[in-house]
Swiss-Prot record:
The P/V/C gene has two overlapping open reading frames. One encodes the P/V/W proteins and the other the C/Y proteins. The lineage of its organism: Viruses, Riboviria, Orthornavirae, Negarnaviricota, Haploviricotina. Plays an essential role in the inhibition of host immune response. Prevents the establishment of cellular antiviral state by blocking interferon-alpha/beta (IFN-alpha/beta) production and signaling pathway. Interacts with host IFIH1/MDA5 and DHX58/LGP2 to inhibit the transduction pathway involved in the activation of IFN-beta promoter, thus protecting the virus against cell antiviral state. Also interacts with and inhibits host IRF3. Blocks the type I interferon signaling pathway by disrupting the RIG-I signaling pathway. This is Protein V. The keyword Metal-binding applies. One of its GO terms (biological process) is symbiont-mediated suppression of host cytoplasmic pattern recognition receptor signaling pathway via inhibition of IRF3 activity. Interacts with host IFIH1/MDA5 and DHX58/LGP2. Interacts with host IRF3. Interacts with host RIGI regulatory protein (via CARDs domain) and host TRIM25 (via SPRY domain); these interactions prevent TRIM25-mediated ubiquitination of RIG-I and disrupts downstream RIG-I signaling. One of its GO terms (cellular component) is host cell cytoplasm. It comes from Sendai virus (strain Fushimi).
Length: 384
């Protein structure tokens, strides 16, 4: 609203200063009278006269002369003058906001450049309206609006002058890594990477490396001698011929491990352990003693014998079997003898001799008074 009031005020001042201000006002009034007096049918009529060339006003009083000649007629030059006045005023009103908007844009540019000059380190001061400014900044900001750094300037310079990198490499100068610091040269100890590799060079010299990689024959012999002195299986038990696969145990003689042949002093335990010829673990002699014979697997009655823990063919006699149970609140222990050659049953019962060599009565069952069951074996025992 203030802007419109300002424009209307300026229009009134211009009309006062202009010599033909009253004529333009009268032209507007005449144009409005013509529009209001026209009939509705004339609206859809020929309006080609709107596109005619606008002629300059012939002079003051032209509209009055046309009106005096004919009361109901409106001259064409007056309407053209009215249109020209309206267009000039409209153009003048539209040009003023454009000028103000242009001035506002210039102020924003000045503020932006002033802010860039305070934040950027390489900002170039530019003057507005000097005529030589093309509108392109020498150092334009990046996408985020911040000024470019020195590293980006160097990258742009290297892209503009590709021959400079070749000159640096020819002169032996280290090439800097883009976006970082240059890698130091390691000298003789490490390979010169010149920025082409991020792996650090070795810190030791080539002479020490050669000694470690290619040892001398004397050093190899010293290492071998030292390794031979060390025990191969330290902290573990020595292997015996019985546990090592593919080896045979020494032949067993008729003397047991505790005894010694005649004419030789008895050996001690330390000799068995520390001796290099004999194994560390003594092997038990499994050979049956002289004067005993084994029982055949198929006796005369046809029942095969399965030797095991319950049967020992080297011992003849009886074995004592017990049964413990409770009767009338008392614990009863009954025992009896069975031949050694018989099998041990889960259910206690009296068994007969299988080998026909076991004695009928032994010192264990000689004092038995009563048998658990009167079987033929018990009757035979007590009968005898």
């Amino acid at each position: 609203m203030d802007q419109d009031a300002f424009i209307l005020k300026e229009d009134s001042e211009v009309e006062r200063e202009a010599p033909g201000g009253r004529e333009s006002l009268s032209d507007v009034i005449g144009f409005l009278d013509a529009v209001l007096s026209s009939e509705p049918t004339d609206i859809g009529g020929d309006r080609s006269w709107l596109h005619n060339t606008i002629n300059t006003p012939q002079g003051p009083g032209s509209a009055h002369r046309a009106k005096s000649e004919g009361e109901g007629e409106v001259s064409t030059p007056s309407t053209q003058d009215n249109r020209s006045g309206e267009e000039s005023r409209v153009s003048g009103r539209t040009s003023k906001p454009e000028a103000e908007a242009h001035a506002g844009n210039l102020d924003k540019q000045n503020i932006h450049r002033a802010f860039g000059g305070r934040t950027g380190t390489n900002s170039v001061s530019q003057d507005l309206g000097d005529g030589g400014d093309s509108g392109i900044l020498e150092n334009p900001p990046n996408e985020r609006g911040y000024p470019r750094s020195g590293i980006e300037d160097e990258n742009r310079e290297m892209a503009a002058h590709p021959d400079k990198r070749g000159e640096d490499q020819a002169e032996g100068l280290p090439e800097e890594v883009r976006g970082g610091t240059s890698l130091p040269d390691e000298g003789e100890g490490g390979a010169s990477n010149n920025g082409r590799s991020m792996e650090p060079g070795s810190s030791h010299s080539a002479r020490v490396t050669g000694v470690l990689v290619i040892p001398s024959p004397e050093l190899e012999e010293a290492v071998l001698r030292r390794n031979k002195r060390r025990p191969t299986n330290s902290g573990s038990k020595p292997l015996t011929p019985a546990t090592v696969p593919g080896t045979r145990s020494p032949p067993l003689n008729r003397y047991n491990s505790t005894g010694s042949p005649p004419g030789k002093p008895p050996s001690t335990q330390d000799e068995h352990i520390n001796s290099g010829d004999t194994p560390a673990v003594r092997v038990k002699d499994r050979k049956p003693p002289i004067g005993t014979r084994s029982v055949s697997d198929c006796p005369a009655n046809g029942r095969p014998i399965h030797p095991g823990l319950e049967t020992d063919s080297t011992k003849k006699g009886h074995r004592r079997e017990h049964i413990i149970y409770e009767r009338d609140g008392y614990i009863v222990d009954e025992s009896w003898c069975n031949p050694v050659c018989s099998r041990i049953r889960v259910i206690p019962r009296r068994e007969l001799c299988v080998c026909k060599t076991c004695p009928k009565v032994c010192k264990l069952c000689r004092d038995d008074i009563q048998c658990m069951r009167p079987d033929p074996f018990c009757r035979e025992i007590f009968r005898s």
